[in-house]
Each structure stands twice: as structure tokens, then as C-alpha cells.
């Protein structure tokens, strides 16, 4: 058996894998166990009662978290004309059309989010095999294909997170940094859950939000008692 690291031993001692913790207790536990030499992200996994094999039960969207994510986000925008100027004024690091596409093809992808105006999709569409596997392909459902690119840039900079369920029906995303105030982490999580519940597929049967777990970048997951969250109302 592989030798457990000191951190993993501490996590096993502190975290009861069979227990769903009060949200405040769960956050306190994460903060206590976050001993990495960098400020770890706080991530969430939400198990949904959907059948991901059916297209009408897939959940996908985006939300600007009330307290942001704590990340500096670099934004690339495919657009032209007045929209290009608006995107730059909104804070986009990279703005262009064919010239920006050539950078992407050359492997120059120093950005975290890609936004496109509808008229630019003829250019972006040819980059699907590069952007798609990296989760960067713009999509109307996440607000990254839009005529109002300036607003999309501002949302990305303000702490918007995009989400979609994986093949097991689980949503994975971030809700902030471990050095966030506990109340801010709780409110970010609640805002995400409200957004997910608004998107419950009509075809989904039974319990929709089955399990909520939070973790840090280098830590184990801590299950959260949903009854301690405002979003359960």
C-alpha cells in the first residue's frame, strides 16, 4: 500500500467521509486543512439527478458569483468593428478575428475565456478541435456567443463561472479561494445552487440535487448538509 502523506493522514483523521457537514463547519474544516504553499481554490461538486445520456437532461450555463472567484481572468474576444473597441474598453486582453485565430492555431493561448460575437463564429468554428477539448469553445448557453461582447467581458472579469454536468451527471466548478470570508463562500455556493435549480430539466425525475461536496485544490471533499443552505428553500 502506498504511504499516506502527512496531509492525507490529517485529512483522514479530521474528515468523516460518512457525514454531511453543516456548511459553516464544512468551510471551517476546509480552511483548517488548506496547508498548501499557495492560496487554494474552493471547488464544488454537485451530483444531479439527471440522465446525462439524454440530451434534454443535460445542465449547462453560467453565473456571475456575488463575490467573484478570486481569479484574474484573461479574456480573448473574436469580434470586429465597434464591438472590438467595446471589448477592449471592457478589459479584454486579446481582440481580433483571423489574426487572433492564427495565434490560437500557433498555440498562443494566453487566455482563460473565449467570447465571440455571432458574426465571428465563422472564424471560431474552425478552431473547434483546439478550443473544444480545453473547454474554451464559445457557446450561447453560457453567454460567450453574444452580440453584447462588452457585457460578456465584464461578466467574465467579475467572476462568472461556467458549468456543465459531466458524463456522471456531476457539476464541477469553483466558488472562490480558501482565503475568502466564510460568508462569501457560503453565498457563492448558494447562488450557484439557485442557478442550477432554475435549470432543472423537465424530464429529470426524483431528487434533483442529490449531493453537494466542497474541497480545496489539494484537499479531500467534504459533503455539505443541504438543509444548512439558504438555496434549499
UniProtKB/Swiss-Prot annotation:
GO terms for cellular component: cytosolic large ribosomal subunit. Transmembrane segments: none annotated. One of its GO terms (molecular function) is rRNA binding. GO terms for biological process: regulation of translation; translation. InterPro entries: Ribosom_uL1_bac-type (IPR005878), Ribosomal_uL1 (IPR002143), Ribosomal_uL1-like (IPR023674), Ribosomal_uL1/biogenesis (IPR028364), Ribosomal_uL1_3-a/b-sand (IPR016095), Ribosomal_uL1_CS (IPR023673). Keywords: Repressor, Ribonucleoprotein, Ribosomal protein, RNA-binding, rRNA-binding, Translation regulation, tRNA-binding. CDD domains: Ribosomal_L1 (cd00403). Coiled coil: none annotated. Binds directly to 23S rRNA. The L1 stalk is quite mobile in the ribosome, and is involved in E site tRNA release. Protein L1 is also a translational repressor protein, it controls the translation of the L11 operon by binding to its mRNA. Belongs to the universal ribosomal protein uL1 family. Part of the 50S ribosomal subunit. This is Large ribosomal subunit protein uL1. It comes from Shewanella amazonensis (strain ATCC BAA-1098 / SB2B). The gene is rplA.
